[in-house]
């Protein structure tokens, strides 16, 4: 019996909606990364994007445990000497509610063209409304 290998044109992608209200950042990101990669499917193939589309709503109500809201820092660099910037989770979440989740999921996906294609299937919205009703997404319950 030969090992099955999924072909890109044979993959059937579904749309799911996840409500992030009250969910913990890291646990939610791990489940989303798992679904974006397609590891929940029996046809999973490492070199083929077999994942589903994920729409995350209410990310403005997402939380972190402990005192990470103040102590968790995000760093970026301008490229100039001394040009390092740091932002706490609380500040970033207040200004850009979806960015902490996006950065967490991005860190859990493969680096390279395949990982970037997987990340494009993630849609993040701060409120409860989203423009993907035409895709008829199913509700996905995540224990996070």
From Swiss-Prot:
GO terms for biological process: negative regulation of translation; translation. Gene3D superfamilies: Ribosomal protein L13. GO terms for cellular component: cytosolic large ribosomal subunit. It comes from the Bacteria. One of its GO terms (molecular function) is structural constituent of ribosome. Keywords: Ribonucleoprotein, Ribosomal protein. Part of the 50S ribosomal subunit. Belongs to the universal ribosomal protein uL13 family. This protein is one of the early assembly proteins of the 50S ribosomal subunit, although it is not seen to bind rRNA by itself. It is important during the early stages of 50S assembly. This is Large ribosomal subunit protein uL13. It comes from Nitrosospira multiformis (strain ATCC 25196 / NCIMB 11849 / C 71). The lineage of its organism: Bacteria, Pseudomonadati, Pseudomonadota, Betaproteobacteria, Nitrosomonadales.
């Amino acid at each position: 019996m030969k090992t099955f290998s999924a072909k890109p044109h044979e993959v059937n992608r579904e749309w799911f909606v996840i409500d992030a209200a009250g969910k913990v950042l890291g646990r939610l990101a791990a489940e989303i990364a798992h679904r974006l990669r397609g590891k929940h499917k029996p046809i999973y193939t490492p070199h083929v994007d077999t994942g589903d589309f994920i729409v995350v709503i209410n990310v403005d109500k997402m939380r972190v445990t402990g005192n990470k809201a103040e102590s968790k820092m995000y760093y970026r660099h301008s490229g100039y000497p001394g040009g390092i910037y740091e932002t706490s989770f609380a500040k970033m979440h207040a200004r850009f509610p979806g960015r902490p989740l996006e950065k967490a999921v991005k860190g859990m996906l493969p680096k390279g063209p395949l990982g970037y294609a997987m990340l494009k299937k993630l849609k993040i919205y701060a409120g409860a409304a989203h423009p993907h009703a035409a895709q008829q997404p199913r509700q996905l319950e995540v224990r996070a």
